[in-house]
Amino acid sequence: MSSNAQLFDRACRSIPGGVNSPVRAFRSVGGTPRFIKRAQGPYVWDEEDTRYIDYVGSWGPAILGHAHPDVVQAVREAALDGLSFGAPTRAEVELAEVLIERLPSLEQVRLVSSGTEATMTAIRLARGATGRAKIIKFEGCYHGHSDSLLVKAGSGLLTFGNPSSAGVPPEFVSHTLTLEYNNLAAVQAAFAQHGADIACVIVEPVAGNMNLIKPAAGFLQGLRDVCTQHGAVLIFDEVMTGFRVGPQGVQGLAGIKPDLTTLAKVIGGGMPVGALGGRADLMAHLAPLGGVYQAGTLSGNPVAVAAGLATLRLIAQPGFYEQLAAQTQRLTDGLRQRARAAGIPFAADAIGGMFGLYFQDSVPTSFAEVSAGDADAFKRFFHAMLDRGVHFAPSAFEAGFVSATHDNAVIDATLDAAEAVFAAMKG
């Protein structure tokens, strides 16, 4: 049996950094990544046969828990009929119809294979439909790794984009304005200066890539209003929050209709599926109807779509989201109580089946605030919990996820471990 360390050494010889997505490398927390060989319900097992309670959940898709038998059966049955056709299928039509039925803002849907593809296409579509070049995104919001969205904010109220990744020429992001999340005044100022040139605003309506940051009161409605006023496209990136925080995502909770929505994660049930959808007049600009090109060999893959359909059927059961939110709240309430009892500066927040943990006195509202958290305390907490069989995301800037299989016994086992960890941290 290979150890995690042996596998990581081996991986580093054939894969850059030993991983196929950077956060998996444990660089921000140190130590050796756990190589997972199987998962079931709320648990994952590594190559050393150590079991962990899992709050990563494949970074969000595993809302039903890992390897739900109905989803696995749907994948098995679809695979028996063929893995990929490169042609239209009944199942992809059914998935599009389900998404349109569930989300009132969707009139038409285009399936892709990832969240990055969905957001990249949504930006291109907004630019093509409006004939404008500039886009607004927010500091700390992640929308995949396409060039125009790999931007961080600089100083000043209105900041023209600077690359935040090597290999992205400055001119590629020169039309990207990066503003502070939850700062509506900055958005209004940007439109006052550049309104005729702004194609769209793209936002995580609840940010999940700078830990969990909720929108301030009036922020999302303000974005809706300013986009409507200036004829810009409002894009809700619900890749993470779609069907994770409620049956209609954040847009349903907030009562706001974006013009375009991007989806992934839950809608694939653990398989690679993404989607963008929205107003029919905008979607009509996509090829083959319009001049905005988008294509994909595996878009609408029948096996992945089968997993998505099975998942969406199961999460539509009455009471599903109420129970999911209750379990998530049980976790965050319990962690807060135990940290307080130990005298550890700690805050937690939750929405639906998502949560954020912060080693600071209050819940942050921006990237700057979340960055002020105690990074060393998080590292100590992460490794101590991992040693006690609890698997959180290996970064202080990632949200966590609860599944339908995280019952009271699982949550309470997590809290027992946390109580011991907080006590040790204080001591």
Swiss-Prot record:
Top EC class, one word: isomerase
Major subcellular location class: cytoplasm
Gene3D superfamilies referenced in this protein's UniProt entry, alphabetically: Aspartate Aminotransferase, domain 1, Type I PLP-dependent aspartate aminotransferase-like (Major domain)
Pathway(s) where this gene product acts: Porphyrin-containing compound metabolism; protoporphyrin-IX biosynthesis; 5-aminolevulinate from L-glutamyl-tRNA(Glu): step 2/2
Modified residues (N6-(pyridoxal phosphate)lysine): 265
The keyword Metal-binding appears for this protein: no
Any one GO BP annotation for this protein: protoporphyrinogen IX biosynthetic process
EC identifiers of the protein: 5.4.3.8
PROSITE patterns xrefs: AA_TRANSFER_CLASS_3
Known partners and oligomeric status: Homodimer.
Family of the protein in this entry: Belongs to the class-III pyridoxal-phosphate-dependent aminotransferase family. HemL subfamily.
Protein name: Glutamate-1-semialdehyde 2,1-aminomutase
Organism: Bordetella petrii (strain ATCC BAA-461 / DSM 12804 / CCUG 43448)
